[in-house]
Amino acid sequence: MFRYLSKRQWILLLLGILFVVAGYFILPVSVPLIIALITALFLNPAVRWMQFRFRLNRKMAVTIVFLLFVIMIGLLGTYAVTRAVTQLVELADNAPSYINQINNVLINWQNNMNSFTQNMPSEFVDKVSVELQNTIDTTTQTLSQKLQLSNIAAFAAKIPEYLISFLVYLIALFLFMLELPRLKDKMHGNFTESTSEKVKFMNARLSYVVFGFLKAQFLVSIVIFVVCLIGLFWITPEVAIVMSLIIWIVDFVPIIGSIVILGPWALYMLIVGDIAMGGQLAMLAIILLAIRRTVEPKVMGRHIGLSPLATLIAMYIGLQLIGLMGFILGPLLVIAFNSAKEAGIIRWNFKL
């Protein structure tokens, strides 16, 4: 099939391969800059609206939008850290009672197991007991290794590095927001008029699809939030609003879903002996999963024109290649490729 490729297509193919290889090594160390560029692209419509609505120059509009964005991030971060510290303190205070509850459940299980295995062969009972003890020992050893003071200290030692990355992100974001029009002009200056029109079409299509993807995720997550809020008000009204907000935020991330919160919560309630609440939480998780799997493909197909299978494959491959950043870049690359085909930049019309 390669003999049907023209010289221009060979050049584009080689450039694409070089771009992928370079990206594989460069992307992991340039995550703050890439996130800053993507954020600047998302905030650019707000900057243009400020310029049009209030007759401001580019620098003043960028400064206002940037400050509003930083204030929003600061408020959300402060709230998240405060809630996390509060929950950790409550967990530490209630840890003895949690341990006692789990011990009581384990004692009840052991008593039930002893009464259940009275008529069984002693060899079988001994084998099961040994396997259970090995599992408990392995789990305890793993938890002990993860919770060692050295690991906690190593994580704390990386906090300055994270702060530096965040500072680089903020500085790069402000500069990208200022320089976006100039960067676009320089990029289009390297193209012919025909190619420039195709690139503009691809950018417009890509922007439409990306915002459509975010809109679709938001619409699906709103449905999830309403159903989750109603269900939790019926199951545990004391924490219904807070947990619904947490589940809504987590569910906004593709693939992860509400099961990440409701699954462990239901399992814990079953372990401590609250079978009714554990079963209700598990049922709510199943209902939310069914809603997402039913509604999401239709909403996604309507807003971005990318099949759920292609989205899943792109996310998984990107996640395996370059980590969390690939989880986002994977579908974007597929969308960019499809947009380039629609614009005529890439001609994929050969047949075997």
Curated annotation (Swiss-Prot):
Molecular function as annotated in GO: antiporter activity
UniProt note: pH dependence: Optimum pH is 9.0.
Keyword Cell membrane: yes
Pfam families for this protein: AI-2E_transport
Keyword Membrane (UniProt): yes
Compartments (UniProt record): Cell membrane
Topology class, membrane: Multi-pass membrane protein
Function: Catalyzes the pH-dependent efflux of sodium and lithium in exchange for external protons.
Family to which the UniProt record says this protein belongs: Belongs to the autoinducer-2 exporter (AI-2E) (TC 2.A.86) family.
Name assigned to this protein: Sodium-lithium/proton antiporter
Organism: Halobacillus andaensis
